[in-house]
Curated annotation (Swiss-Prot):
Pfam family, one: CsbD
The protein, known as: UPF0337 protein lp_1708
Segments of this protein annotated with the region Disordered: 1-73
Lineage: Bacteria, Bacillati, Bacillota, Bacilli, Lactobacillales
Database matches in InterPro entries: CsbD (IPR008462), YjbJ_sf (IPR036629)
Family: Belongs to the UPF0337 (CsbD) family.
Native organism: Lactiplantibacillus plantarum (strain ATCC BAA-793 / NCIMB 8826 / WCFS1) (Lactobacillus plantarum)
Length: 73
């Protein structure tokens, strides 16, 4: 899955979760509210994971470039 798709998926989970949470609050359905909070938190976790993956990819690519430059010299 591409970085953009991962970010989109995480935002979708956050938004859907928030909607379920609000629905649960309005209707008094505590289970639905909890389900929404959980989904929203999962979306936030996915977002942080996608950020970490991007950072690691950047560091690895930078290290590869440095190694390639050294081998070219």
């Amino acid at each position: 899955m591409s970085d953009v798709n991962k970010k989109f998926d995480s935002k979708k989970d956050q938004l859907s979760g928030k909607a379920k949470e609000v629905e649960g609050k309005v209707t008094g359905d505590r289970a639905r509210e909890a389900q929404g909070k959980t989904q929203s938190l999962m979306g936030k976790a996915k977002d942080k994971l996608a950020d970490a993956e991007e950072t690691v990819k950047g560091v690895v690519d930078e290290a590869k470039d440095k190694m390639k430059k050294k081998s070219d010299d």
